Amino acid sequence: MKRILCALVLALLTGTALAQDAYPSRHITMVVPFPPGGVADLTGRPTAFAMEKFLKQRVIIENKTGAGGAIGMAYVANAKPDGYTIMMALSSISIIPEAEKLFERKSPYQMNQFAPIALISADPTVLVVRADSPWKSVKDLVEDAKKRPGKISFSSSGIYGTLHMAMEMFAQAADIKLWHVPYTGGGPAMNALVGGHVDALASGPSAVIGQIKGGKLRPLATWGDKRLAALPDVPTFKELGYDVEFYIWSGLFAPAGTPAPVMAALRNAAKQAVEDPEFKAIMTKIETPIHYLDAPEFQKFWDKDAAMLAAAVKRVGKVEDKK
């Protein structure tokens, strides 16, 4: 009897070990909490494609949108921590819990519900208007906004989302009042601008470079500490006398509690993905420099960025949307 029990226990332990060693044994879902066309989606798709090569399983993109990304982020925060649900998120992952505090509401998730895998990219946002806009410079826009408070509109990926916060920081620094029109993601926000439904937009470079080159949009300024290589003629806000700096980054996360061996496999796949020639070519094509950080360095980066964004949310305060 003892021999049988020992054999059963050994078989169970061996089977468990083999199951762990076999990760991944099926497809992985990469949740993008925004619609197609935005920075998270544009970065997530080539990342997923490259990771497939090294994980030997499909990595399927699922756009789970709404509430400025909060719906998709909350979904991943509460997903089973087994490595089969991961997420490509933006810096707004840090903003939403802080914004909810302002309104004394319960956040749909907390940041400690996520385990960072890798930072993939980080770029300053770009202020764009349509090519037929009367504003040729930030100075033109600011002067007009002072004459018509609350009349100049801008779209964003959602209330207190990454693109919203960048514009609020600029408006505060310029002492102007703008009209915020939130959408469900960066893609719809850009479509609203191109379609003439709003007047301006802050966006990641990858989402607007094509429209700029195609003559549909005009860049006025960037939120970086230096000019973008892809837009060398476009000044930074700091050059223009506005003390604002803002970056939109894309990073991979898993639910907190994901086993260490699984996290190691995901981290390794992400590292190999950013070194993949095909991935590099795609990122170059969409004018998005790779800014890779492995989990420990990414955690430090995230902590610092989250503190900066928390301070920015408090500075901006409660923002009411004019619908």
Spans of model-derived segments:
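An extracytoplasmic/periplasmic, membrane-proximal ligand-sensing/linker region
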Residues: 25-27, 172-176, 260-323
